[in-house]
Structure formats: C-alpha cells, structure tokens
C-alpha cells in the first residue's frame, strides 16, 4: 500500500507521473501485488486532463468531504475562480469508476461521520450555506457517500474481506443512528444521534 499526500494540482500531476513510471517499469505479472491500490490523499484539486489518469491507472482518490465545506468560504480566493471546477470533483471521479475513499482527517477536522456524510451529499456547510461557484453537481448520492466511508474505504487498505460491509464472516464494525441517514431530509442529518457503536462485535457505546 502506497499513499502520497499533497493538496495542489501540480503535486497530483507529479505523483501520477511517478506512479505511471513505476507501474510501467514492472509488468503486472512480475509485481508482488499485481494491482497495488496506490492512493493519493487529499485528492481535492485535480486538473481535468489528470482525472482520467486515476481511472486508467486504478489510483484511489482519498478525500475528506468536511474539507470541502470549510474551503468553500475561501477557495475562490486561494484557487481563483478558473480552477474551482477542479476542486473536490467527487462526481467526476466516481463516474470514471475511480474508487473514492472517504475520511475525516481527524484531528484536523472533528471526525464526526455525520458531518462527512452531509458534506458529501450536499456540498453545503452545516448551516446550509454555499456559493454558486461551488459546483453542487459534484455532490454524490447517499449510497455513494455510504460506500466512500465503508466499502470503498476498506478496499483502499486491502481490508474488504474483514470490514466495510455487514455480512457473515466479517467484523461487526458499525454505528447505529437514531434516524435513517439514507432517507431523511439533508437538514436532519446532523440531528441524528448515535444510538450504538459496535467494534469487532463488541458494543463500546450505547445510549
């Protein structure tokens, strides 16, 4: 598992170039791991011509939705409006069949899964604020948001056989909320409370 961390679009391009060079140097049949699942952390500013490369090389994009709803207040000043279309392109990447692994970046961010889920499906901050330039069409469906933090996240670290979905033979790692996050209105997501948390089949929190 190789993870590279960086925020800028030029960094992403350089990293993709290095990954491509490494992949080209050893044929799949001669690799210790034929499909290595390399991952770029904070894949939040990607040049349009580089987005296809994630798909072509099977590179995993690791993103933290809470960064997007914080950045929306100042990104137009840091990036410039011409580059905002390249920011947090979750929808584009998923449509290209790229695995998008979600996270919180705690303790930089709060680490509340409700915040990450809401940010992914709405791209608005916790007060519902957004700007027209923030490309709401790049939000994801609720099923995709769920996959980002479960199924796709476990795949990104080679743990899909033990966690990431609820099924026989896997560790029972799950949180139960007081409301159905898949169906309630967006403005109710943050009011949903944790009823129970189970880790490895053991109840570690119960309201």
Predicted regions and their residues:
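Single conserved hydrophobic/aromatic residue that forms the stacking wall/gate
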Residues: 1-7, 11
């Amino acid at each position: 598992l190789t993870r590279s961390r960086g925020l800028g679009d030029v960094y992403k391009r350089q990293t993709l170039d290095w990954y491509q060079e490494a992949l080209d140097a050893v044929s799949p049949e001669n690799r210790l791991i034929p499909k290595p699942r390399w991952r770029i952390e904070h894949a939040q500013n990607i040049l349009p011509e580089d987005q296809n490369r994630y798909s072509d090389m099977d590179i995993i994009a690791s993103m933290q939705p809470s960064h997007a709803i914080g950045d929306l207040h100042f990104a137009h000043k840091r990036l410039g409006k011409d580059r905002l279309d390249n920011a947090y392109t979750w929808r584009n990447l998923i449509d290209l069949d790229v695995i998008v692994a979600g996270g919180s970046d705690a303790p930089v961010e709060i680490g509340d899964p409700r915040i990450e889920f809401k940010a992914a499906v709405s791209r608005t901050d916790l007060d519902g604020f957004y700007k027209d330039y923030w490309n709401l069409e790049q939000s994801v469906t609720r099923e995709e948001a769920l996959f980002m933090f479960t199924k796709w996240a476990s795949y990104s670290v080679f743990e899909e056989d033990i966690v990431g979905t609820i099924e026989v033979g896997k560790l029972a790692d799950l949180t139960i909320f007081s409301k159905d996050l898949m169906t309630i209105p967006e403005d109710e997501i943050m009011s949903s409370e944790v009823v129970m948390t189970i880790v490895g089949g053991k109840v570690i929190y119960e309201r």
